[in-house]
């Protein structure tokens, strides 16, 4: 009697791959008044490391500008994780890498952005949650339309 292999999905390691903050107009920018316009961009990526192990990245770039021209700060964080995925069908692996893993990583990236910006002397930046499932579906639809 053969044993059925059980699916495995686990977090092996969470880490910050890259973290940068630029305040190009310091210290003058701290004396200026106004409500900044904050722009956030998010991207994800993954790569296979070895059998069953994947490195997944969520990169968050936040730019704050005064009067839509003077940059207050530019903060970029790449939060990464090594995930173990075994005995999982390939279509489910892609879904886990594109949705589940980014959902796990994003709160860590959000905290890194907020903490870095606060330590730089600015008010905290509170980033709204991201619907990675909707992003994944859009990517799948775009790939299907291009095929």
From Swiss-Prot:
Record-level Gene Ontology MF annotations: unfolded protein binding
Species, as recorded: Neisseria gonorrhoeae (strain ATCC 700825 / FA 1090)
Stored HAMAP family: SecB (MF_00821)
Annotated family: Belongs to the SecB family.
Compartment annotation: Cytoplasm
PANTHER family recorded: PROTEIN-EXPORT PROTEIN SECB, PTHR36918
Classification via InterPro entries: SecB, SecB-like_sf
Pfam families in the record: SecB
Keyword Protein transport set for record: yes
Name of the featured protein: Protein-export protein SecB
A cellular component term, taken from the record's GO annotations: cytoplasm
């Amino acid at each position: 009697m053969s044993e059925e292999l059980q699916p495995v999905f686990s977090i092996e390691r969470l880490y910050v791959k890259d973290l940068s903050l630029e305040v190009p107009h310091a210290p003058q920018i701290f004396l200026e008044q106004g409500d900044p316009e904050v722009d956030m961009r998010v991207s994800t990526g993954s790569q296979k490391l070895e059998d069953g192990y994947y490195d997944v990245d969520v990169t968050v770039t936040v730019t704050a500008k005064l009067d839509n021209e003077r940059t207050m700060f530019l903060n970029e964080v790449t939060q990464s994780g090594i995930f173990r995925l075994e005995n999982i069908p390939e279509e489910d692996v892609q879904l886990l890498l594109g949705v589940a893993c980014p959902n796990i990583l994003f709160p860590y990236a959000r905290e890194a952005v907020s903490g870095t910006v606060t330590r730089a002397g600015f008010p905290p930046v509170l980033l709204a949650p991201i619907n990675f499932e909707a992003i994944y579906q859009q990517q799948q639809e775009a790939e299907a339309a291009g095929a």
